[in-house]
């Protein structure tokens, strides 16, 4: 790897962000788009609010 300028913030390092924006698509290409897409789409991990399940009526 190339040395990174220590004066740059971590989020401004070259290659730290993909050139295209993230989408809501779940195809294989979009699931491996970036690290965030992989964690949320491919692994299904989200730390947001959980939706309440409705109980089945008998």
From Swiss-Prot:
The modification N6-acetyllysine is found at residues 28, 50-51. Residues 38-48 are annotated as: Core. Keywords: Acetylation, Activator, AIDS, Apoptosis, Host cytoplasm, Host nucleus, Host-virus interaction, Metal-binding, Methylation, Phosphoprotein, RNA-binding, Secreted, Transcription, Transcription regulation, Ubl conjugation, Zinc. One of its GO terms (cellular component) is host cell nucleolus. It is found in: Host nucleus, Host nucleolus; Host cytoplasm; Secreted. It comes from the Viruses. A motif (Nuclear localization signal, RNA-binding (TAR), and protein transduction) lies at residues 49-57. Gene3D superfamilies: Tat domain (4.10.20.10). Residues 1-48 are annotated as: Transactivation. Disulfide bonds: none annotated. One of its GO terms (molecular function) is RNA binding. Residues 1-24 are annotated as: Interaction with human CREBBP. Residues 22-37 are annotated as: Cysteine-rich. The record marks 11 as: Essential for Tat's translocation through the endosomal membrane. The modification Asymmetric dimethylarginine is found at residues 52-53. Belongs to the lentiviruses Tat family. Interacts with host CCNT1. Associates with the P-TEFb complex composed at least of Tat, P-TEFb (CDK9 and CCNT1), TAR RNA, RNA Pol II. Recruits the HATs CREBBP, TAF1/TFIID, EP300, PCAF and GCN5L2. Interacts with host KAT5/Tip60; this interaction targets the latter to degradation. Interacts with the host deacetylase SIRT1. Interacts with host capping enzyme RNGTT; this interaction stimulates RNGTT. Binds to host KDR, and to the host integrins ITGAV/ITGB3 and ITGA5/ITGB1. Interacts with host KPNB1/importin beta-1 without previous binding to KPNA1/importin alpha-1. Interacts with EIF2AK2. HIV-1 lineages are divided in three main groups, M (for Major), O (for Outlier), and N (for New, or Non-M, Non-O). The vast majority of strains found worldwide belong to the group M. Group O seems to be endemic to and largely confined to Cameroon and neighboring countries in West Central Africa, where these viruses represent a small minority of HIV-1 strains. The group N is represented by a limited number of isolates from Cameroonian persons. The group M is further subdivided in 9 clades or subtypes (A to D, F to H, J and K). The transactivation domain mediates the interaction with CCNT1, GCN5L2, and MDM2. Transcriptional activator that increases RNA Pol II processivity, thereby increasing the level of full-length viral transcripts. Recognizes a hairpin structure at the 5'-LTR of the nascent viral mRNAs referred to as the transactivation responsive RNA element (TAR) and recruits the cyclin T1-CDK9 complex (P-TEFb complex) that will in turn hyperphosphorylate the RNA polymerase II to allow efficient elongation. The CDK9 component of P-TEFb and other Tat-activated kinases hyperphosphorylate the C-terminus of RNA Pol II that becomes stabilized and much more processive. This is Protein Tat. It comes from Human immunodeficiency virus type 1 group M subtype B (isolate BH5).
